[in-house]
């Protein structure tokens, strides 16, 4: 049986609001740069997030959200931007940050609790040794990412239910969406990407991706400027040579040769014409 431990920190909402008013920002931004360049970046990311929240009616999904926090640049940025909107009065939901420690060797257990506590962010950290499950089931030559991700998602769903959350919030950005689209196209033989909003198979939880319009490059710059204590995603040593890396390089080359194509591709995913494709399930060619 897997060892399971849970760590909580709960705070009164008013404590965060009082701290925010004191410095005219959420505490997480107290050490943020004051440069014009950073402010433009921050506003751009907030604009993209607000657009996604509106386009996919994310605010209709309930009043308490579980925000997945892996310790990577995207999840840190996601949490900070959500807290920024909440402080501005534009996000009327309760936020609970959640990290699932999957037992990966060398995982620095102190980083996330120290970070979240220092900014009085409500959080839950749970230990579930899914790493051992993955290594037992797969050969060393196989990529762990897919099974690891499925086990992580299942545990996050369970935690969301236990905490009374209506939605699980993930940090996938524009580039993740496009890479997934091309992976499905080239390797899965289907047209599919990552939706901004969906329901889980059981139908009791929403999965939201407020960063679907945000560029990875912007998230990288934001993370560096905010000096988040990044936890690398190569602890298990299974990241090299993945198909996703090939898609990432392909998209970089396309963007280098034809700037602006990534944004065009994202717009295309929201402008589908079933009659111009070949799928009979989505268009009745017999009566056309």
UniProtKB/Swiss-Prot annotation:
Binds 1 [4Fe-4S] cluster per subunit. The cluster is chelated by three Cys residues, the fourth Fe has a free coordination site that may bind a sulfur atom transferred from the persulfide of IscS. GO terms for molecular function: 4 iron, 4 sulfur cluster binding; ATP binding; magnesium ion binding; sulfurtransferase activity; tRNA binding. Pfam families: ATP_bind_3. [4Fe-4S] cluster binds at residues 145, 148, 236. It is found in: Cytoplasm. Its main location: cytoplasm. Keywords: 4Fe-4S, ATP-binding, Cytoplasm, Iron, Iron-sulfur, Magnesium, Metal-binding, Nucleotide-binding, RNA-binding, Transferase, tRNA processing, tRNA-binding. Pathway: tRNA modification. One of its GO terms (cellular component) is cytoplasm. It comes from the Bacteria. A motif (PP-loop motif) lies at residues 70-75. The thiolation reaction likely consists of two steps: a first activation step by ATP to form an adenylated intermediate of the target base of tRNA, and a second nucleophilic substitution step of the sulfur (S) atom supplied by the hydrosulfide attached to the Fe-S cluster. Belongs to the TtcA family. PANTHER family: AMINOTRAN_5 DOMAIN-CONTAINING PROTEIN, SULFURTRANSFERASE-RELATED. This is tRNA-cytidine(32) 2-sulfurtransferase. It comes from Bartonella tribocorum (strain CIP 105476 / IBS 506).
């Amino acid at each position: 049986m897997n060892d399971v431990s849970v760590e909580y920190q709960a705070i009164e909402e008013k404590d965060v609001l009082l701290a925010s008013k004191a410095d005219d920002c959420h505490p997480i931004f107290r050490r943020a740069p004051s440069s014009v360049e950073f402010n433009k970046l921050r506003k751009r990311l907030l604009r993209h997030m607000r657009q996604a929240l509106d386009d996919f009616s994310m605010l209709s999904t309930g009043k308490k959200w579980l925000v997945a926090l892996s310790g990577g640049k995207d999840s840190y940025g996601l949490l900070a931007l959500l807290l920024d909107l909440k402080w501005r009065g534009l996000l009327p939901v309760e936020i609970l940050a959640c990290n699932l420690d999957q037992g990966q060797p060398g995982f620095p257990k102190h980083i996330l609790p120290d970070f979240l506590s220092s900014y009085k962010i409500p959080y839950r950290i749970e230990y579930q040794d899914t790493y051992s499950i993955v290594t037992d089931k797969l050969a060393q030559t196989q990529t762990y990412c897919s099974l690891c991700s499925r086990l992580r998602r299942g545990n996050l769903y369970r935690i969301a239910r236990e905490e009374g959350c209506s939605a699980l919030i993930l940090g996938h950005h524009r580039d993740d969406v496009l890479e997934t689209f091309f992976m499905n196209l080239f390797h899965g033989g289907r047209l599919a990407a990552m939706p901004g909003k969906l329901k889980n198979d059981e139908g009791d939880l929403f999965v939201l991706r407020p960063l679907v319009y945000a560029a990875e490059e912007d998230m990288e710059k934001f993370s560096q400027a905010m000096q988040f204590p990044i936890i690398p995603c190569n602890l298990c040593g299974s990241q090299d040579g993945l198909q996703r890396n090939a898609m990432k390089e392909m998209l970089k080359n396309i963007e280098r040769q034809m700037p602006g194509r990534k944004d065009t591709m994202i717009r295309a995913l929201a402008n589908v014409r079933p009659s111009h494709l070949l799928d009979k399930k989505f268009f009745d060619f017999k009566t056309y």
